[in-house]
């Protein structure tokens, strides 16, 4: 029995030691992760919080309350790392020199061109190249089935013949020396080729296997692992999990504040992903919780107001953006006034010197933030004015429920300007001369003359013309006679001297 109790005590002591070690490791990981997060070393912070999450979930369970803080900070560090990656490659290209391309081109030129070589070396290189080209031609002919063993034997026998013919003239000696040089260069080139051939054969052997390996590598690259999740997606999952766990467990003030912080970070994530409606919803929920828990001069309220104004401006809801920017400005100005009052009240108190220094530092930070918010407000006002100008411009396309002129709502019978014709001819108007029908008398059939009319003599026609002339002369003579009668009457009255006027004068005298 004594031995059993000793064994049990030893087992419990080992368990306590392991638990203590795990807790220490968790605390170390959390402390190191928070430090890295403050120092903007987000990759190290991600590693530390990831290890802490695995240890806590293994000890307490994945849905335990003890895991909430680790989940939250793990999500925040992932969000910051994703921002760094998305921000034009972050700061990864800061230490990279800008003239890498020029350096590569210079190296390539050095490989292919050597402008500082002397003439002797250039001549040697030319001879070697020519010899190599000749050997290449021979090799190609051998591959085609043209044996050249006889020529090779002759080339090998040339140095022997040159040794025997040492007594010949200088010209022949020069030629023999050149032949020796050429043969030596050819042999060197052949030796190099023989040494290179097994390498080439090893590279060229089994083309099918190499092709399959290349295709398999491409397929592996194209096929994405299902476990490979982006940092942004993983950050969203961890923040959502932390929010749910904080809501599920003890509803204390600190937990509520952490729920608000989870909503704030989820809203920032929505802005990064350009999901502005989701970001606005998270910011509004955060604001509701913060208004209940925080004082009116808290900087967290100003941060939430600012983020809401930013999200509304992205959605082109400029009135809401102005409202929240202005509220953020009011919070900051109220906090500056409060801090100035505290500084004045604690002035001269040596015990609160540190507090005064921190308060003065915060006032300086807030005074730097206020101009930024004022510039945001000015930008929103300008954007709103431009939008109003576009709404009233005649070139803007009319939306539904608007008239094309922009003067208000249009009726159902109205049409936009683009569909109204410029001029329309009324149906009752006189037709245009171009459209009027031409003379069609030539198309009308004329009545054929009767045979009696065709047989009439020409004399009847002459008689008719004479009758017409007689009638004209009679009318003329009748008119002339009437004029003559009138003149005769007047002459008679004048010659007789009897007129009506003298008789009337005589009657008056009587």
Swiss-Prot record:
Q: In which tissues is it expressed?
A: Embryo and larvae.
- Which keywords describe this protein according to UniProt? Developmental protein, Nucleus, Repeat, TPR repeat
> Motif Nuclear localization signal in this chain: where?
444-451, 465-471
Q: Where is the composition biased (Acidic residues)?
A: 98-110
Per UniProt, the ranges with Low complexity bias are 204-217, 398-411
Q: Which InterPro entries match?
A: NASP-like, TPR-like_helical_dom_sf, TPR_rpt
Q: List this protein's GO terms for biological process.
A: CENP-A containing chromatin assembly; DNA replication-dependent chromatin assembly
Cite a single GO MF annotation.
histone binding
- GO CC terms, sorted: nucleoplasm
Q: Which family does it belong to?
A: Belongs to the NASP family.
Function according to Swiss-Prot or TrEMBL:
May function as a nucleosome assembly factor during rapid embryonic cell divisions.
What protein name is recorded for this chain? Answer: Protein HGV2
What is the scientific name of the source organism?
A: Halocynthia roretzi (Sea squirt)
Gene that encodes it: HGV2
